[in-house]
Structures are given as C-alpha cells and as structure tokens.
Design a protein with these regions (language model features):
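Conserved ABC transporter NBD signature motif
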Residues: 56-70
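Helix N-cap at the start of a conserved alpha-helix in ABC-type nucleotide-binding domains
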Residues: 158-160
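The feature captures the beta-strand-to-loop junction immediately N-terminal to the Walker
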Residues: 34-36
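Conserved beta-strand
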Residues: 6-9, 16-26, 57
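Catalytic Walker B motif of ABC-type/P-loop ATPase nucleotide-binding domains
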Residues: 147-151
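ABC-family P-loop ATPase nucleotide-binding domains
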Residues: 79-134
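Helix-to-loop junction immediately C-terminal to a conserved catalytic motif
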Residues: 49
Length: 230
C-alpha cells in the first residue's frame, strides 16, 4: 500500500520552482531525499506535511490530501529547532503524550536516557546535539504511518550516529514508511531502500538503492558525489 503519493507536484517561489515531481513510497520502505542545499528538499517535506500549499499537482498520505486527518498520520522532525526554550525535556514528553494519541512516553524516556539526555534540563540548557537527539526521540516515539525526518543528524557527534540510526530503524511503527532528508549520505546509506536526487527543484535520479548500486558499480554516497560533482 502506498503511504505517500505525489503526482505532478509543483511549488514556485521567487527564483525557485519545485516542478512536476512524482513520488510513491510504500509500507516498510525508507526513502532518502538527497540533494545540495537549496534543491527543494525542505519544500517537498513541507508540502507533504501540509505546512504549505502546492501550486499544482497532488500529494496524499494514505490516500488523504494534506489536512488535519493526514497530519495525524505523520510524525515530522523539522531541520530547525521547534522546541520551546523554557520547557524541560520531561515536560516535552508529557506534552507530546497529551497532544498525540499515538505517542509512547515510556519509549521516549528510555531512548532519552540511552542517548544521555537529562529530562530535568530545560531546552535552552541543551547543546545543539542534545536538542537534535531530543527532537528525534519525540518524533520516533509516535506510532505514525509516515515519518518525515529533515536532516536528523545535524549537530550530532559521529559517535552517536550509529545509535541514532538504530533508534530510527527500531522505532518505526509496523506498516509505516520513512522519508529522510540528509547530506550525510555515508551515515544514512544503510537505511535507504530508495533514493531521490533533487537539484534546483527537479528530480535528477530516482530508484531502488540496491539496484542503483549494482548498475553504477558504486555506493549511493559515491553516486551522489558524481552526480553533483561534490
């Protein structure tokens, strides 16, 4: 079953256009949304989550157009910090428990502890890396149908990335799908079932990760560097 479908999706800003994008993501799959800064990755994620309206085309989550019903099925981790500075981490867990019916507080507390995040600290007392870990834990502690993670490894020390990868893989609800936007491709490559390369709002390359590795004779990370000449 398709958890996410985009057909001819368009969004234009001054000097930029996300154009005629087609995408399908089915249950159990992880899609890597890959591209340089300014390629349209965050714009696409916001369209999927219903935070901005498309100028054309269609997007659906489990057959639902963006709106309150579809957003209840989506767990979204934005690239930029969205947590209020004055709240304590434990308070955030209680807030999510009250706000989301599918949130699992015991799981969140266990993950926070294993990642070294003190629930008694206020958000403003956390380092950038600890804030990122907290956002990720909150997102992955929901039993969502679709997880949208925008640069989940930003600000996280390399030593913690393997554990975070394990958290992402183990935390997904059964029957869910995951879309992950990242520029740290070598770290995330083991997660990815499918990839979509974006450049200036256009899809340059897409397909199953394993098939692309076989056809091109290189890793997805190496292919990314070749396509974008990094």
């Amino acid at each position: 079953m398709a958890v996410l479908e985009c057909e001819g999706l368009r969004k234009a800003y001054t000097g930029f256009e996300l154009g005629e994008l087609d995408l399908s993501l089915t249950e159990g799959r992880v899609l890597g949304l890959l591209g340089p800064n300014g390629s349209g990755k965050t714009t696409l994620i916001k369209l999927i989550n219903g935070l901005i309206r498309p100028d054309g085309g269609r997007v659906a989550v489990c057959g639902l157009e963006p709106g309150p019903a579809s957003r209840s099925l989506v767990s979204y981790m934005p690239e930029r910090m969205q947590l209020p500075d004055w709240m304590r981490v434990g308070g955030l867990v209680r807030f999510y428990e009250d706000f989301y019916r599918d949130f699992e507080p015991q799981r969140a507390r266990k993950l926070l502890s294993s990642l070294g995040v003190d629930e008694g600290l206020r958000v403003k007392q956390l380092s950038r890396g600890l804030r990122q870990k907290t956002q990720l834990v909150l997102a992955m502690s929901r039993r969502a149908r679709l997880y949208l993670l925008d640069e989940p490894f930003g600000g996280v020390d390399p030593a913690s990335r393997d554990y975070i990868l394990e958290t992402i893989m183990a935390g997904r609800a059964e029957g869910s799908a995951l879309l992950i936007s990242t520029h740290l491709i070598s770290d995330a490559e083991g997660l990815l079932d499918d990839v979509l390369f974006l450049s200036e709002g256009k899809a340059l390359l897409s397909g199953e990760a394993e098939q692309l590795r076989r056809e091109r004779g290189m890793s997805i990370d190496a292919l990314f560097r070749e396509v974008f000449r990094c």
